């Protein structure tokens, strides 16, 4: 999104994120995460907006090399698809399957497409923010306790964090480093995990595979332990 300042982007993100609690879709239970269970609606609404804005920016900020943002989103969607199909919530399964079907050909052209043959496509801010928004909505839907839709999911909050563990920790680390060095939080830099791996000698594809493998390991372990 060219020509739009970071603060204006953030304001628009807050506005669109506010649509969720206005539609009565918000985080109302942390399932024991940090010792917290049921939370008041007002607190849940504010938390929902904050979480959704964070996820949108996490997916956007980690989009630094070809295929990374889309790959991590695809992995998280696969985890959510497993959860929703297990609970037989087919509406969300259809949404996830459709989005995964879009991402797979995109990844092919984004990673292996030849720019000189006009075969390479890019995501940009609009694409990564949209992916982050949809992914955030699905995660919040999973975290919201509604006994009429889904039974009590012990560990739902922790599993949701795991699905986006790599972009979550990467954003936290980058923000902390920028604050410590008194740099603007919204200014782009080359301090993300993929930049670190490439400076260590990896190629773009090696860094991509390493980050995907790390994310997959955490997600598979937590999914196998979920509700056991």
Please report, for each region that a protein language model flagged, where it lies by residue:
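Intramembrane alpha-helical segments
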Residues: 1-91, 101-113, 212-222, 227-228
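Alpha-helical transmembrane segments
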Residues: 68-228
């Amino acid at each position: 999104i060219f020509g739009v300042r970071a603060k204006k982007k953030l304001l628009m993100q807050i506005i669109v994120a506010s649509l969720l609690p206005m539609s009565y879709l918000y985080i109302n239970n942390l399932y024991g995460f940090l010792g917290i269970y049921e939370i008041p609606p007002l607190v849940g609404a504010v938390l929902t907006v904050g979480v959704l804005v964070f996820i949108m920016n996490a997916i956007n900020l980690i989009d630094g090399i070809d295929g990374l943002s889309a790959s991590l989103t695809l992995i998280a969607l696969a985890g959510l698809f497993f959860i929703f199909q297990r609970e037989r919530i087919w509406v969300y399964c259809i949404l996830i399957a459709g989005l995964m079907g879009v991402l797979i050909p995109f990844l092919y052209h984004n990673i292996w497409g030849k720019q000189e043959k006009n075969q390479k496509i890019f995501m940009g801010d609009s694409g990564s923010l949209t992916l982050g928004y949809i992914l955030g909505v699905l995660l919040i839907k999973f975290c919201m306790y509604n006994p009429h839709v889904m039974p009590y999911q012990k560990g739902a909050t922790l599993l949701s964090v795991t699905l986006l563990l790599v972009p979550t920790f990467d954003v936290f680390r980058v923000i902390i480093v920028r604050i410590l060095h008194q740099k603007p939080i919204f200014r782009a830099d080359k301090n993300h995990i993929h930049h670190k791996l490439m400076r260590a000698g990896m190629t773009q594809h090696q860094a991509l595979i390493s980050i995907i493998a790390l994310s997959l390991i955490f997600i598979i372990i937590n999914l196998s332990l979920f509700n056991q």
